[in-house]
Amino acid sequence: MTHITLLSANDFQVSDWSGGKTKQLYLSPPTGHYGKREFDYRLSTATVELAESQFSDLSGFHRILMSLDQTLHLHNASRQKETVLAPFTPYFFEGSDSITSRGTCTDFNLIYSDHYQGQMLAISDREELSQDEAIQFIYALSDLMVTGTGLPSLNLETGQLLIVEKEAQETELQIMFSSNQPKCAPLAIWAGLTHIPTK
């Protein structure tokens, strides 16, 4: 059984952070609290409006970050590593890492607890995806159509979020992305979470 949820702008929570504005797309559980760090996973997009900003301390969580438009220069003081992050490239790091970001952009974030393993990809027109993650997110960067095995054909508008939750981990989800206005830039961001069984 596959459960599908489609969320739009009215479902998202917008708030300020030290470097700009953040839009919370999804928080699990819905009764959780991001500020108190009481949640399993969180998907968000944010504007980075300062030339230099410091990432929030999210100790106990793992993070994936992707710029949706501009190149970022990241300094990870915890690992003494510099990264030049091109748009639509995922950057994996620990929530406890001390990171300074240089450059302004709009970014896409997935934060998740130790109970999950996360992935993130930028999706182009006519691309096919075959993934077995139990929880999958598709964030539309432009109007597009999503079709797939076990899925109805869905038209997503720019800024909408599609959440696909599968009960059977064994079955891979085959998804096809297409747009009436083909372009070079990615159509969507895909993110997936696999639940890690407790030992």
Residue ranges and their predicted role:
Residues 1-199:
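Jelly-roll (double-stranded beta-helix
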